[in-house]
C-alpha cells in the first residue's frame, strides 16, 4: 500500500513519532486506589467535586471533546462505559496535566520545551490507571525520583480537593498521607544486580508509543476487558484519532523503523556472566595506562616529564607509591609483549630526515668503516637480533680494547629502545632483577660469568626462564634481545680457579660477534639519539628487512662467531663535488647500480700532463677513502677502466695543450 492512500492525520502521527523516536523519556503511572476512612468508602470515581478553577475547567472540557469525538467516529461498536466513569477520566486527565504544568513551573521549564503523551487505561486487576511519558532536554535522568515525589504531592493535593465524599479535615489529611505513602504516582525503574538499588529507567519516546500504547484496544466493557479510554499528547496528534488509525500509525512506524539487516549474535557463557561495575578510579587508571603506552613511558622519570598531571593524581591517592609502581609495570609489560626492540626504534624515525640521511657517514657506520667492514651487513645483522629474528643467536656482543666505540653504539641502541633492563653485576644473588618485562637487556662491561653461566646462556639464547627477584617470588623473563659490551674474553668461563672449556662453544653460538679494535679519536663524540632510528628506517626502505630469511637472501648465510664482516665488500668510488646526482642515485639503491667511476678534476689534470707509472692499475683501487658508498659488491660491478685506457681516450679527443688549458681554467 503506497503512502498516498493514508490520511494526512495518519502520516502526521507517523512523522511525529519518528521525530521523537530516540528521545529518552520518563515513564510515570498515576493511579487512584479505593480506600476506606472511618467507615467511609472513597472509590476511584469519587473525585468529581465541582471547583471554581477556569484553567481546570478548560482542561476538562478539552478531554470531554476528545473522548466524544472519537466515540462518534467509531460506528462498529457502542461503548457501555457509564457516564460517571467517563466524567472521572476527563477530570483525571485535567488533574494530571495540571500536575505536569506545576512541575514545569517549579523547574523553570517552559511547557512548549517538553514533549508528553498521556493515555488513560483500564485493567481487569489494576482498575483505572494513567500512563504519562515526559521528555525534555532540561530534565536529566538523575531528577526522575525528584519529579515523582513532586507529582505525587501535587496529585494527592488535587485528589483531596476534588473528593466528592464528605470528609472531615482529619480524614482529608489521612487520605493525602495514604496517597503519598502508597506512591499513587510511580516511575519506571530497574534494580541493579550488584548494588540492589532501584534506578530510574528511561524509555524511547516514539518507540514506546508506537509499540505499546497505540496497539491497545478501545475500552468497551469495563468489567469484561481491558483497554484505553483516552489519549492526549503535546503535539495534538492522537487526541482525536480513532482506533483503526492508531493501529495504522503503529504498523507504518514499525515498518519504516525496521532495520535493513538483522544481525544474529551468539552470546557465549562468558558474556552471560554477571557484569561488574567499573569505579571511577578504575576508569581513570585505564585511561592513564592507554596514554602511557601510547607515549612509550617506561620509567618514573619519563612519566613525570610526559604525564605530570596523572603522576601527581596517583601519587596523591592512598597507597600512591604502590599504585604508580604497578601501573608502570603494566605499561612495560604491554610494550614487552606487543612490540620488539626493532619496532620501538623504528617508531622514532623522522621520515623528513630520511631522504637526506647518509648511512655511510653516520657515526656508527664510520666505526665499522674504520675496520674495513660492510657496514650495511653489520647493521642488518644487528637489526635482525633486535627484532628477535636471530634464532639462538640472540645477543649482540661488542668486544675489544677500550675507546673503540663499543659502549657508545650500545648506549645509542638502548636509548632508542627505551624499555631497557640493565644487568647488575654487583648484585651477586639477583643480577637480573631489573630485566623482567623489557624489550632489551643491556649488559655493560661483562666479565667472567662464573657460576651464573647457565643462566646467562639461557637469556642470551632467547629462552623463557624464571629468575629470582629480591623480596619477591620468581618471575618469568620472556625471549628478550641482549646487547653486551666487554673488554674481556667472555667465552672463557672460570669457576673458582678452574676453567670450564665446555661452555666456550655454546657461548659463541649465542653471540653476534662484533670485535672493535680501532681506537677512536678524542673528538669523535657520541652517537646521536636520532641515528639508530634512521638506520633502521634506511634498512627497511632499501629492502633490508629485519628477518633472518631476508638476511640470508642478501648475504648468503646466517652470521657465525667468526663472521667476516668485510665480505662482500662495498665498492667505493671517487665522486666529484659536481656529481651529486650520481651520489644520490647510488645511495638510494645500493644493489642495483652499475657505474663506471669518474676521477676528480685534479687527478685528471695530472693524468693529462704527466705519464702514468702504473698504466694497468684500475681506478677503483686508487679511489678516495672518504667517498660515499655505492652499495654494490665486486661481483656486481663492471670492470673499471685502467689509467692507460683513460689516457688513450682523452688524447684521442683533446690535444695536450687544450687539455692543460681547460683544466687550468677550471682550477683557477
Swiss-Prot record:
Q: How is it modified after translation?
A: Phosphorylated.
State the name under which the record lists this protein.
Initiator protein NS1
Main EC class the enzyme belongs to: hydrolase
Q: How is the cofactor bound?
A: The endonuclease active site can probably bind other divalent cations.
| Assembly description | Homooligomer; when bound to DNA.
- The gene for this chain is NS1
Domain-related comment: In the N-terminus, the endonuclease region is involved in binding to the origin of replication. In the middle, there are the ATPase and helicase activities. The C-terminus probably contains a transactivation domain.
Q: Where is this motif: RCR-3?
A: 212-216
